[in-house]
Amino acid sequence: YHLTTDLTDRAIEFIKDAKVIAPDKPFFMYFCPGATHAPHHAPQEWIEKYAGTFDMGYEQYRELVFDRQKQMNIFPAHAELTPLNPYTAEQSVDGKPWPPLDVVRPWDELSDEEKRLFARMAEVYAGFLSHTDHEIGRLLDFLEQSGQLENTIVVLVSDNGASAEGGPNGSVNESKFFN
């Protein structure tokens, strides 16, 4: 069982039902799969697609992604990658330096165990997001196959970028963070 698949199945059924009940009326559906919110989970085969992808470390990976985005003209060729921790030279809102646990530690300062853990967490996150993309695609495929895609407005909004799950020590136990 996976929630995102179930929500997609139910969304498709909702549209089918709406079109049976009132075929000429528009419908409104708010589809919220919750992807990349905790808990991070995805079918194993989606996670394994990313096995080893992040072993190089996050600094090197973000450089590769940024270069690819420039090649795709998402960013102009002259764009520069932002610093990993842009605020460390500034004071925190309380007037003090940024706390060490509020910044991303350089990959080469992590232990081998931390590197394995954080690389695996990135694999799970990526698998979760890719699986969600697949399920959104399945919903769009249904709209196309049922002849409704051309008469449907789809608005895709995300409130997530990176995830705070795992925190600076890798624990997904949120209570532990506050103790």
Regions found by a protein language model. Name each.
Residues 1-179:
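Active-site-proximal cap/lid insertion segments
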